[in-house]
């Protein structure tokens, strides 16, 4: 039986790891043992930060919406409440984009939210649902 030598596969694995470690600082880029650890850690960071990116962007959108609604005399929470009561379902990413690029359209949404909030103060929920429909 022929002797199994693993030179080709291990060389390919090492090459793969070193390619992933390209651009790292110091021995992390060219020493296989250290490069392997650095690549594993970088993949952990990448996995974690893909989740964090979603949170960060949502927080950014909310801050932008809050700033834009304050210009119209409303807080973020009241604005979202007003939109929900008016039956307007636009996500925060689109609202943030509208606040920056289409201020007139955003102002119209704020006005609708204000109307829904004021209307609900003076009526019952059933009367509001029939008026909106």
From Swiss-Prot:
The source's domain of life comes to Bacteria
Keywords tagged on the record: Ribonucleoprotein, Ribosomal protein, RNA-binding, rRNA-binding
A GO term for molecular function? rRNA binding
Q: Which cellular component terms (GO) are annotated to the entry? A: ribonucleoprotein complex; ribosome
Q: Name one GO biological process term.
A: ribosomal large subunit assembly
| InterPro entries in the record | Ribosomal_bL20, RIBOSOMAL_L20_CS, Ribosomal_protein_bL20_C
* A Pfam family of this chain: Ribosomal_L20
- Which CDD domains does the protein's record reference? Ribosomal_L20
Family label: Belongs to the bacterial ribosomal protein bL20 family.
Which HAMAP family does this entry report, sorted A to Z? Ribosomal_bL20
Q: What does this protein do?
A: Binds directly to 23S ribosomal RNA and is necessary for the in vitro assembly process of the 50S ribosomal subunit. It is not involved in the protein synthesizing functions of that subunit.
The name this protein goes by in its record: Large ribosomal subunit protein bL20
Organism in which the protein naturally occurs: Mesorhizobium japonicum (strain LMG 29417 / CECT 9101 / MAFF 303099) (Mesorhizobium loti (strain MAFF 303099))
């Amino acid at each position: 039986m022929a002797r199994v030598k693993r030179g080709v596969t291990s060389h390919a694995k090492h090459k793969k790891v070193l390619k992933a470690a390209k651009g790292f600082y110091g021995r992390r880029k060219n020493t296989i043992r250290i490069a392997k650890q650095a690549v594993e850690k970088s993949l952990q960071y990448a996995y974690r930060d893909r989740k964090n990116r979603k949170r960060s962007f949502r927080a950014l959108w909310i801050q932008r919406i809050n700033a834009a609604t304050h210009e119209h005399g409303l807080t973020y929470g009241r604005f979202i409440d007003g939109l929900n009561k008016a039956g307007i379902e636009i996500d925060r990413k689109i609202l943030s984009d509208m606040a920056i690029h289409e201020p007139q359209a955003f102002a119209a949404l704020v006005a609708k939210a204000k109307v829904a909030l004021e209307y609900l103060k003076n009526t019952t929920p059933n009367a509001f649902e029939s008026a909106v429909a």
